[in-house]
């Protein structure tokens, strides 16, 4: 019997996806700085596109690093 559970979205209903919200965006990137795929995040396709766009914008404005140099 396949009991699949609905995942709870890590993005709260009233929370906006914005490039300035670094705490939210850092949940969706790996330690190396790569953007996590949608199947790992458990978010909708629309939210994934918005997260990706916000992460890229934050990287461009130097709010997030392109690569993690701590390795």
UniProtKB/Swiss-Prot annotation:
Keyword field contains Isomerase: no
Gene: rps18
Keywords: Chloroplast, Plastid, Ribonucleoprotein, Ribosomal protein, RNA-binding, rRNA-binding
Record-linked PROSITE patterns: RIBOSOMAL_S18 (PS00057)
Name of the protein described by the UniProt record: Small ribosomal subunit protein bS18c
Gene Ontology biological process terms from the UniProt entry: translation
Assembly notes: Part of the 30S ribosomal subunit.
Species for this entry: Chlorokybus atmophyticus (Soil alga)
Localization, UniProt: Plastid, Chloroplast
One annotated Gene Ontology cellular component of this protein: chloroplast
